[in-house]
Amino acid sequence: VDRYGSLLLNHKTYIDAGHDEYWSGQQRTNVEAARDAGVNLMFWSGNEVYWRTRWGNAYSADGTPYRTLISYKETWSPSASIDPSNEWTGTFRDPRLSPPAVGGGNPENSLTGQLFKVDDVGSNLQAITIPYDDANLRFWRNTSVANLQPGQTATLTKNYLGYEWDE
């Protein structure tokens, strides 16, 4: 999709089917262009389009292009860009060190419709409480949550959702 984005226009739908968090700036530009041209987009997992990356040549003697995925995760840098290139490789949403014109400040939900929320590896996630107001969502059909009454809540088991999810 990064190199041959125009091929997306040959299709009615683009399906992103799994934990696809590392995207190059050109990949995102191409998917946005396809969307703007009428291609339907489907994102079937969480934590997509999160880290902005770039492609580099292989480290082998032949230096084959597009063989090395580069991500300095500059969002984790406290105050300065650490990637030696001028291309931002932090999160798409981070505007601190990279304005939208060069790759930052453009959150993933502006493309996917959802925002990555939790990355809680190695800790004990707390139980999740579902209020009555959410009980009628389709997700809860045929579960005990769907039977909540006004003022009631349901509590999911600790660690139920895993350690990464979107909002």
Identify the role of each PLM range.
Residues 1-57:
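Helical hinge/lid and interdomain linker segments adjacent to catalytic or ligand-binding clefts
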Residues 59-62:
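Short, hinge-like loop/turn segments at secondary-structure boundaries
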Residues 65-167:
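Glycine-rich, aromatic-lined ligand/substrate-binding cores of catalytic
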